[in-house]
Amino acid sequence: MHIVCLTFDFDGISGFMSRGQVGPSWLSRGEFGPRVGAPRLIDLFRKFDIQTTWYVPGHTIESFPEAVKNVIDAGHELAHHGWTHRPPASLSAEDEERELIRANESIKKISGQYARGYRSPSWDLSPHSVKFFLKHGFTYDSSMMGDDYTPYYARQNDVIELEKPAAFGNETPLVEMPIHWSTDDSPHYEFVRAETSLRQGLKNAHHVEQNWVDDFHYMRETVEWGVLTYTCHPFISGRGHRIMVLERMIQQLKNDGAVFMRVDQAVEAFKRRQPQV
């Protein structure tokens, strides 16, 4: 079986706010997601009868509740993406856990249940993250890059010192659903001009489509069973030509035998196939 998980980091305006980009023009870019991009994507997935996973910051849930409710009502998974969209590695242990709890309460308030899955803003966990996920009942994370097509059980308590060999910690029950920047729409598409840097983005969407389809073909040719996770953002991939490319890609992958699942469903399929010893 070759599984595809389409995932969406539903940042709203929180990603810009977390970087101090709070002017009206910056925030309008994020607002496009709940106002325009998300409804388009929900309609697209209804057309193909597939379910996806949306990682949503608490700030987005509290600021755009109707947009988030529409995601839930369409049958998609609502998962955790922090509260302020600040990466855990930038927070103290106390603030990291506080944000984890606060956002999970927002998720329960709107959906009726706590999140099972977590994805770090900016894919930057702290040394404490896995411990907190286990403590608060998460079954999976999707923030690390230790594989491409095979989920694995995350470790904790690694000891990493510059001039010593790595001392790897113990395996935990937390399933890691690996991701990578090459299958994230943001570095390919998003134009970001800051005071001291410029990320051009705005790549040809057809080239991105071909790369992403090729990643699936490689999985199909090299592993008997695997999961490929694509990461998108409603304010990025919800625009004209990009959503057309996404539609074509879904059709191509379906034709090529892809089985589309929510991430929580793929986690359960992995655990059945490879139960922890």
Regions from the PLM with identified roles:
Residues D9, F45, L78-H81, Y118, ...:
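Conserved, mostly hydrophobic/aromatic
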Residues A38-I42, P65-K69, E97-N104, V130, ...:
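Generic structural signal for well-ordered alpha-helices
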Residues M1-E77, Q252-K254:
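Active-site beta->alpha N-cap acidic-glycine motif
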Residues E62, G75-L134:
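Long, hydrophobic, well-ordered secondary-structure blocks that form the structural core
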Residues G30-R35, T53-P65, R86-E96, R119-H128, ...:
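Acidic-and-aromatic substrate-binding clefts and catalytic sites of carbohydrate-active enzymes
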